[in-house]
Regions:
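Short linear motifs at protein or domain termini
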Residues: 1-111, 165, 236-244
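General structural signal for alpha-helix termini and helix-helix connectors
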Residues: 35, 107, 111, 131-139, ...
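C-terminal all-alpha effector/ligand-binding and dimerization domain
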Residues: 2, 17, 180-244
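A generic short alpha-helical patch detector that favors 3-5-residue windows
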Residues: 17, 21, 93, 97, ...
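Helix-loop "lid/cap" segments that line or gate small-molecule binding pockets
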Residues: 102-114, 155-162, 210
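Conserved amphipathic alpha-helical segments that form helical-bundle/coiled-coil interaction surfaces
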Residues: 116-185, 203-206, 218-229
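A ubiquitous short alpha-helical element
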Residues: 88-92, 110-116, 137-141, 187-196
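Alpha-helix N-cap/N′ positions at the starts of helices
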Residues: 78, 101, 124, 199-202
Length: 244
């Protein structure tokens, strides 16, 4: 983030000022795939994509490898990568499975109760989310910061569940298209993008409220609803072939 972004930040809460190098390339490419910029099977040219995004070829190549792990692109041997063909049913099924698994994690944590250390970690994590939305608009770097915050929240929840099998099952499921909690299908309109991400943050707050109240059913239900919210983006399904 540049100097101007740091000086505009409100002192409380502190705004995120570090993002992973090249992460914005992954997010941008994921959005292009979700919006149907590449037809299924179409080769994604590294040079053309790098020029479109205003970066060198290396971060594009790194991003494509990451998106291959997410099931969004497939390797074409020495020819690079192509957008993977997928159906709405495939995406819905993968997201539903994630909701079930993360819902189980939330339920287990609500049943056991948070330790003081766990509660502190979740408080610190949610504070990162609050900082992102404090100004009511998304500034440069905020989408990247949300990506990190969102991934941290989901990882904390699954780890705190105390069941390693949940994490293993989620890791396997994450190789399916748009199944990962990190596979954000973002809006191109800034106002819609803010609303979409802010809604996801409020879901996190709701889940944690249920966990702190030891309400197992509500915690599980809230986490499932949160996962299915990804299906609400029309752009996510614009390029998908309907499953009849």
């Amino acid at each position: 983030m540049d100097t101007a972004d740091r000086t505009e930040a409100k002192p409380a809460p502190k705004r995120p000022d570090r993002v992973k190098p090249g992460q914005h390339v992954i997010i941008s490419l994921r959005r292009m795939i979700a919006q149907g910029r590449f037809a299924p099977g179409e080769r994604i040219g590294e040079i053309a994509t790098a020029e479109t995004l205003g970066v060198s070829r290396m971060p594009v190549r790194t991003a494509l490898r990451a998106l291959e792990a997410e099931g969004l692109v497939e390797k074409l041997g020495a020819r690079g990568y192509a957008a993977r063909s997928m159906t709405s049913a495939e995406v819905e099924g993968a997201i539903e499975v994630r909701g079930v698994l993360e819902g189980l994690a939330a339920r287990r944590l609500a049943a056991r109760g948070l330790s003081a250390a766990e509660d502190m970690r979740f408080c610190e994590c949610l504070a990162r989310g609050e900082a992102i939305f404090a100004r009511g608009t998304l500034a440069q770097g905020d989408v990247d910061a949300f990506h990190d915050y969102n991934r941290a929240f989901h990882a904390l929840l699954v780890a705190a569940s105390g069941n390693p099998s949940i994490a293993e099952a989620i890791a396997r499921n994450d190789h399916l298209p748009f199944a990962s909690s990190s596979a954000l299908a973002l809006e191109s309109d800034p106002a819609s993008e803010f609303a979409h991400l802010h809604s996801a943050h409020r879901d996190h707050v709701d889940v944690m409220d249920a966990i702190r109240r030891r309400d197992e059913e509500r915690a599980e239900r809230a986490m499932r609803v949160h996962a299915r919210a990804a299906l609400g983006s029309e752009r996510l399904f614009r390029r998908l072939v309907p499953q009849g």
